[in-house]
């Protein structure tokens, strides 16, 4: 059996030009939005990078560049579905995924189960294979000042 580990990281800053945010494929009511070329889903972006990294296929920017207008304002679930196809082509399966959302606000806990269900559905895995946790920076740094949100994702693949 062959195992591969991937790590992904993403960060987006808040903007007053939008309202509400999308994290893990779930829309969350908030007075600000996230600045991004796509929908700004930091969790899905980091997850895509984790899977691509484990497969040795670069990163999300290589496959879906922010200079390409076809990806402007696109739903990030599209990226994850395309990367799932790459995973299948390489004949790897997901053992588990562990995600950390780092945000001072809004609170993520009420939305985590919906996020897990959304991601499991796209990746065609069990919800139990995905863990999502949220933390703050205790008001330190740009996240603590509520200027943005970051995520880390680790995935373990096997074949």
From Swiss-Prot:
**Functional pathway:** Isoprenoid biosynthesis; isopentenyl diphosphate biosynthesis via DXP pathway; isopentenyl diphosphate from 1-deoxy-D-xylulose 5-phosphate: step 4/6
In this entry, which stretches build a coiled coil?
none
Q: Which family would the database say this protein is a member of?
A: Belongs to the IspF family.
From the Swiss-Prot or TrEMBL record, give the protein name. Answer: 2-C-methyl-D-erythritol 2,4-cyclodiphosphate synthase
Return the NCBIfam families for the record: ispF (TIGR00151)
Q: Which UniProt keywords apply?
A: Isoprene biosynthesis, Lyase, Metal-binding
Is Chloroplast given among the entry's keywords?
no
The source's superkingdom equals: Bacteria
User: What reaction is this protein's catalytic activity?
Assistant: 4-CDP-2-C-methyl-D-erythritol 2-phosphate = 2-C-methyl-D-erythritol 2,4-cyclic diphosphate + CMP
Which amino acid positions bind 4-CDP-2-C-methyl-D-erythritol 2-phosphate, per UniProt? 10-12, 37-38, 59-61, 64-68, 103-109, 135-138, 142, 145
Write out the function statement from the record. Answer: Involved in the biosynthesis of isopentenyl diphosphate (IPP) and dimethylallyl diphosphate (DMAPP), two major building blocks of isoprenoid compounds. Catalyzes the conversion of 4-diphosphocytidyl-2-C-methyl-D-erythritol 2-phosphate (CDP-ME2P) to 2-C-methyl-D-erythritol 2,4-cyclodiphosphate (ME-CPP) with a corresponding release of cytidine 5-monophosphate (CMP).
Q: Which organism is it from?
A: Francisella tularensis subsp. novicida (strain U112)
Give EC number(s), comma-separated: 4.6.1.12
Co-factor requirement: a divalent metal cation
